Amino acid sequence: MLTPILALTALALIAGALLGFAAVRFRVEGNPIADQVDAVLPQTQCGQCGFGGCRPYAEAIAAGEAEINRCPPGGQDTVQTLADLLGVEPLPLDEERGEAPHTPQVAWVDEAVCIGCTRCIQACPVDAILGAAKQMHTVLKGECTGCGLCVDPCPVDCIHMVPVDLDLAEWHWPLPQNDTARREVA
């Protein structure tokens, strides 16, 4: 009775040691440049750049497959920060992708008009819209990134982008990085 238990324990220890060695030996490192670029992007996950989100866009920039000027939510400030980070010339913002918002915006649902079709919920990349089929929907203001992807799918046009008051009670966007923090990322 004791022999099978000891044999299985020994096999488990050997398999665990082999898996541990393989995890260390064959570890896949992430691209540190893509990590730095991703830290600069606004994380709206809007897809206006032509990629599925901010991380795929950062990986394309790091691989040299995409220009640094394709992020309308980040605006020209993000283009300048990316140019400084990568040591390239800043390009003007690609206006074909959309305009940079002058003030942060969030989605607002006119609940009296909402028919509960759930199309906006499916379109939201950050799950900032609450609701169920045939029920009214609402936007979690603190979670909304202002990408606007929920506006077009709405069949009754009850979703509007409204500016956010820029006071301390409503400020949910990351503060601008100073030069010291930027050097730590680099």
From Swiss-Prot:
GO terms for biological process: electron transport chain. Residues 1-23 are annotated as: Hydrophobic. Residues 105-134, 135-164 form the 4Fe-4S ferredoxin-type domain. The keyword Transport applies. Disulfide bonds: none annotated. Coiled coil: none annotated. GO terms for cellular component: plasma membrane. The keyword 4Fe-4S applies. GO terms for molecular function: 4 iron, 4 sulfur cluster binding; electron transfer activity; metal ion binding. Pfam families: Fer4_21, FeS. [4Fe-4S] cluster 3 binds at residues 124, 144, 147, 150. Gene3D superfamilies: 3.30.70.20, Electron transport complex subunit B, putative Fe-S cluster (1.10.15.40). Its cofactor is [4Fe-4S] cluster. Part of a membrane-bound complex that couples electron transfer with translocation of ions across the membrane. The complex is composed of six subunits: RnfA, RnfB, RnfC, RnfD, RnfE and RnfG. Belongs to the 4Fe4S bacterial-type ferredoxin family. RnfB subfamily. PANTHER family: ION-TRANSLOCATING OXIDOREDUCTASE COMPLEX SUBUNIT B, OXIDOREDUCTASE. This is Ion-translocating oxidoreductase complex subunit B.
